[in-house]
Amino acid sequence: MPKWKRRRYMSHIGVICDREDIQATMPQFVVGNARTLLARQIAALRRGRPLNVRLIRQKSAWSNGRLTAILVRHIAAALDGRSGRARDVQVLLLLDAAKIHFTPAVLRACKAANFWLVIIPPRLTFLIQPLDTDAFALYKSVLLDAYQEARSRSANADGDLSMTEFLPCIDGAIQSVLEGRPWAAAFDRDGFGAGQRALDDRVKTRL
């Protein structure tokens, strides 16, 4: 693989919730480093993206505390945009134990949004984090299929996709998987709903 390709990275900070009626409004952050999302292209690439998909260009494609705090504010704005939140509903924000997820800025954002931050313990995301247990594997599979299909249609002789060609693959996978499926049962099975009455046996066995 050419060196220039090895320097190009993207990540997707995904959000799902247990409310099917608002899932499509949840923010999705697609992050690319400066070598992947070129400064001269970023404005054009952002045009035409779904309203809840934010394309972010920064030095690194990895998330950080600043982005996490921004994400919290975007989630709060999406919820408040739905005629206000019901007073009897408490939002739980489930994040893994990476240090970037509980920086002072993130904690302040959660407090301002009245979110309860729930940190999934290390090495347990595979078991009780709904994105990991139910969403990401399917999302990656759908994205790979879309990528291969786009490559087959690409005008480039080597099959490489431009960002203009690749980003719709991500948009489609988000809409098909993250927004196109109900996730309440996943939260229930992982222990975050239904009073834990629907807790999956695999969780009981492993914990």
Question: Model-predicted segments: where are they?
Answer:
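RecA-like helicase/translocase P-loop NTPase motor core
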Residues: 1-207
